[in-house]
C-alpha cells in the first residue's frame, strides 16, 4: 500500500511539474511573439493545458494523501478550461475586426488566393482587392501605434 501511494504521489508531482513547464513555455511565447494573434494563441493553448495538468496533479495528490476530493479544484478546472479558450478567441476576433497588425515573414500579400467571403456574388478580383485593403489598414494601424 505504501508503494502504491508513493507511485501515485510521483505521478501527481510529474503532472504538476509538466504543467509548470508548459506555463513557462507559454510565458516565453507571450514575450517572444510579435503580434496579438500569436500571443493570444500562446496564452490560451498552452496555459489551458498547463492549468489542466497542474490541477489534475493537485487533485490526484489530495485524493492519495488526504483522502478527499476537492470540489473547488474541480470547479476551477472546469471554469478555466471553458473560459480561457473563449476569452482568447474573443480577443483575437476583436483584434482582427479592428485591423490589428499581423506579423508575417514575407512581403507577399496575404489571403489573395483564399475566399474571404461566403458571398457568391464577389469575383476573385474583388476578394483580392478587399484583402489588399484590409492588409493596408492593418499596416497603417500598426505604424500609427508604433510611431513609424
Curated annotation (Swiss-Prot):
One of its GO terms (molecular function) is sodium:proton antiporter activity. The keyword Ribosomal protein does not apply. GO terms for cellular component: plasma membrane. It is a multi-pass membrane protein. It comes from the Bacteria. The chain crosses the membrane at residues 11-31, 51-71, 72-92. Keywords: Antiport, Cell membrane, Ion transport, Membrane, Transmembrane, Transmembrane helix, Transport. Residues 127-148 have a biased composition (Basic and acidic residues). Residues 125-148 are annotated as: Disordered. The keyword Zinc-finger does not apply. InterPro entries: PhaG_MnhG_YufB (IPR005133). It is found in: Cell membrane. May form a heterooligomeric complex that consists of seven subunits: mnhA2, mnhB2, mnhC2, mnhD2, mnhE2, mnhF2 and mnhG2. Belongs to the CPA3 antiporters (TC 2.A.63) subunit G family. NCBIfam families: CPA3_mnhG_phaG, PRK12586.1. This is Putative antiporter subunit mnhG2. It comes from Staphylococcus saprophyticus subsp. saprophyticus (strain ATCC 15305 / DSM 20229 / NCIMB 8711 / NCTC 7292 / S-41).
